[in-house]
A protein has these predicted regions:
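Sec-dependent N-terminal signal peptides
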Residues: 4-16
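Aromatic-lined ligand-binding clefts that engage carbohydrates, nucleic acids, or primary amines
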Residues: 30, 53, 83, 88-110, ...
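Surface-exposed, low-complexity/disordered Ser/Thr/Gly/Pro/Asn-rich loops and linkers
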Residues: 46-82
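Extracellular and analogous surface-interaction loops
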Residues: 80-90, 153-158
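Extracellular Ig-like/FN3 beta-sandwich strand-entry sites
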Residues: 162-164
């Protein structure tokens, strides 16, 4: 079976008092790194210089027809994108909708906010050459739904700032 590395829909929607706003769309431009060694420890933080990283539209994969950016097969890929927040005090929650193959860790401004079940427990360091414990297939391409991860306002208040913020994702495969 061919494995596909996908971030078809990592979408961070923020809920204000009277409406939803999408902060990161699935096909937004991302900076990404296919590592051959461990990236800098601050790669997922807002002030990290990612200008040497490659850039491409979201929907990363191996070229199965639904990818915005095609990459070579690898055990891991690191992604970053920025979004703006105005009036952080009005946010009540955020939702990350994730469709992925095989595992991921998501960060807001360097703070871990979500992790797939097939990686070591939350807040545990996962090296670039780590393979997930087992397979997880993306589901949107087959008519399924993405996973939803809710982040409450107390967590958002401690992670986000008014102005530019960074949403970063570390993606791992079960094998190459």
């Amino acid at each position: 079976m061919t494995k596909h590395l996908t971030l078809l829909l990592i979408m961070n929607s923020v809920f204000t008092q009277d409406h939803w706003e999408t902060a990161v769309f699935a096909n937004d431009e991302w900076r990404y790194l296919v590592p051959s060694s461990e990236p800098d420890t601050n790669w997922n933080e807002e002030y990290f210089d990612d200008s040497d990283w490659a850039q491409g539209p979201g929907g990363f994969g191996y070229g199965d027809g639904d990818d915005g950016t095609i990459i070579d097969q690898t055990l891991s890929v690191y992604f970053r994108t920025t979004f703006n927040v105005e009036e952080i005090t009005k946010l009540t929650r955020a939702i990350i909708s994730a469709d992925y193959d095989d595992g991921f860790i998501a960060y807001l401004n360097g703070n871990e906010v979500a992790r797939s079940y097939n990686l070591p427990e939350p807040s545990t360091f996962v090296p670039f050459d780590f393979a997930t414990y087992y397979d997880h297939e993306a589901s949107l391409y087959d008519g399924g739904l993405p996973e939803s991860i809710v982040i409450d306002s107390l967590s958002l208040d401690s992670m986000l700032i008014d102005g530019p913020n960074v949403f970063a994702v570390q993606l791992h495969n079960v094998s190459i």
